[in-house]
Amino acid sequence: MGLGAALVAILPLIGVVATALGDGQADIALSDLSRYALTSVALSAQVAVLTAVLGVTAAWLVVGHDFPGRRWLSWALALPLAAPAFALAYGYADLFDAAGDLRIWMRGTLGVDMPFEMRSLGGAGLILSLAFYPYVYLAMRAALLNQSSQAIEAARMLGASPARAFFQVALPMARPALAAGVALAVMETLADYGAVQFLGVQTLTPGVVRAWFVFGSVEAAARIALPLLAFAAVLMWIERMGRSGADHDSGRGRWRPLTLQPLPPVKAALATGFCLMLVGLGLVLPLGWMAHTMIDITPEWPRLIAAARHSVGLAVIAALVTVALAALLALGSTRHPLAARIASLGYATPGAVMAIGLLIPAAVLWRLVPGSVGGFGMGIALLIYAYAARLMAAAFEPIEAGLTRVTPSVVQASRMLGRSETGTAWAIQLPLARGALFTAALVVFVDVMKELPATLMLRPFNVDTLAVMADNYARDERLANAGWPTLLLVLLALPAVLWLTRKISTSRPGEP
C-alpha cells in the first residue's frame, strides 16, 4: 500500500527527468538557465537569512519571556500562512509604488525615499520572508518548548547573561529544527510563482511556466525544472535530517519546562511591538491596503462566486484524496520506510514541475478521451493528481504522528481476534487517529487554496480558481480588482489556519 502511494508522488518527477534527458528540441539557452538558477539561489539566500532572524527571535520571545499579549501572539504569529505570497506582493507593490501617494509624500515631506524598489530582487526577498517566516517560527517554537530548562539554568548559574545562554546553549540545541524550518521556507521560495513573476524576478519556477505558455515547449520547461529537482532533493534531505535531529535532541535527559522570564516595561513593550510588527507586516498591512483600494471597485460577482466554488471544490476533493493516500503511506511506513522518503520529494517539488511531469501523459490521454466532457474530467483528475503528489508528504506527517499514539497492544489484540491488517486499520487505527486525519486534511485544503502554477498549467478551459483569477487581474495591473479574489481566498483559508495555529500553540511538548 505504501509503495503504491509513493509511486503517485514520484511518477511525475520521473516524467520530468525523462523528458529533460530525451531527444526533443528544447529552446532554452544555457545563459537563460544560468540566470534563472543564480537568481533563485540569491533569492533563497535572502529568504533563508531573514526568515531565520525573524522566526528565531519571535520563537525565543514567546517561549522564554513574559510580556503583554504573549499568549495570543504565540498563535497569531503563524497567521501569515493563511495568505499566499502573491497577496503580499500585490499589496506592497501597490502601496510602495514609485508614483504612489505614500512615496510622493515620503519624498516631499520627509526628504527620503525607499532604499530599494519592491519590484526587485531585494523587494521579493523581503516579501517572501514576511510570508514564510512562520515555518521557522513554528519549528523553533516546538524545539524550544521541548528543551529542558536545566541546561539554560546551568549556564545562568555559571554567570552567562540571558542572551549568551540563548546563543550558546538553547540555539545550538535547536539547530536541527532551525535547519528544518529554513529548508521549508526555501522550498516555498523556490516553488513560488505568483509573487516573483509579478515582481519581475526571473527565478526557475516562472521560467518553467514561461517555457510552456510562451514557447509551448515541454522539453524546455523540463530542462529548466531539472535544477529545481536537484534543489528540492537537497532541501528535503536537510529538512528530514533537521527533523530527526530535533526529535533526537528533545528526548535527552530529564525534562523540565522553560521558565518564563518577566521583562521590564520597556523591553516588554519592545517584545510586544516586534511580534505585532511581524503579524502586521506579514498579513494586516498588505491585505488592509488591498481592502482599502478595492472599496470603490464593484466585483464581477458571477466570476468571483464561480472561482470560489472551484477553489473550495478542488481543495476539498484534493484533501480527501491526499489524506487517503497519506494514510496508506503511514500505515505501510513500518514495513516500507523508504516509501515515505520517496513521497517526501514530492512536497519539496514546485507545483509547476509537477505539472510539467503530467503534461505529456495528459496530451496522450486527451487524444484518447473524446469530447469536451472527457477533456474536462481529465483536466480535473490531473489537477487532483498534481495536488496529491505534491502534498502527500505534508499530510503524512500528522497522520503518522497520530498513528504512533495508538497503543500497539490494541492493534495486536485486534489481529489476534482474527481481523486482517486492513480490517484493523479501518476498525481501530484510523478511527483513533481521526484528529490527525482532520489536521492533515486542513493542511492540504489550505495549500491547495493557495496553489497557483500547477492550477494555471493543468486546469480545464474556463475553470478559474481564486488564485488564478487574482493572477489574471494582476497581469493586467488591475490590482484593485485583484483584491476581491485575493481577500476572499484568505477569508476562506483563515478558519483552517486559525484552527491549526491554535492547536499548535496549545499542544504540550512532545505532542504532534
Regions found by a protein language model. Give the residues of each.
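Juxtamembrane helix-boundary/capping and inter-helix hinge elements in multi-pass membrane proteins
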Residues: 65-69, 145-150, 160-163, 214-218, ...
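Internal, well-ordered domain-core segments that constitute the primary functional module
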Residues: 159-163, 177, 181-185, 195, ...
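Short, charged juxtamembrane terminal tails flanking transmembrane helices
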Residues: 157, 503-512
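Feature of multi-pass inner-membrane transport and sensor proteins
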Residues: 148-149, 164, 195, 201-206, ...
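Cytoplasmic membrane-interface regions of multi-pass membrane proteins
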Residues: 148-151, 245-255, 327-337, 408
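Glycine-rich helix-loop "coupling/hinge" segments at transmembrane-helix boundaries
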Residues: 190-216, 450-479, 512
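Membrane-water interface segments at the C-terminal ends of transmembrane alpha-helices
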Residues: 1-23, 31-145, 173-193, 221-240, ...
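Short helix-to-coil transition segments within interhelical loops
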Residues: 65, 144-174, 201, 406-407, ...
